């Protein structure tokens, strides 16, 4: 992704650089190929936003493209601070991010627009097999197929963040597709990457 940004930046000007940040830049592939890389605090640290803003100001950065889902809400909530400094963050509004970060709310959003999605089960009305995952999870951490009631461990059943959904067999019945879409500042689709 960084190399794609570098290629596109070179089409506009020789002076545009692509910078990257990470808690541990030496462990980040993006930081290794970026024109410059910087260490920043963890996303859950109080000083995270200030550190990103300071870096952007110090290095005349005018555009920030978040690539980690866990940073989206914090950056969306701080958007006005960045915009006041002439720094644009390519990000959805905080309300939409909140809906997308809580899978229970995402299901409601899909239903509102008649988009089919897996049924969410009440804990006492599970249908097997089902799929268990934290409602606010990321990167499939904690996600698990539950084949039978015997697969329900105490850790799973007592975790208040765990939700249960209809199991969708993406290996044999359905295909999963991910599409990243980028819009301009007027909301026009500029690029769709499957």
Regions found by a protein language model. Give the residues of each.
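Phosphate-binding site of ATP-dependent enzymes
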Residues: 147-194
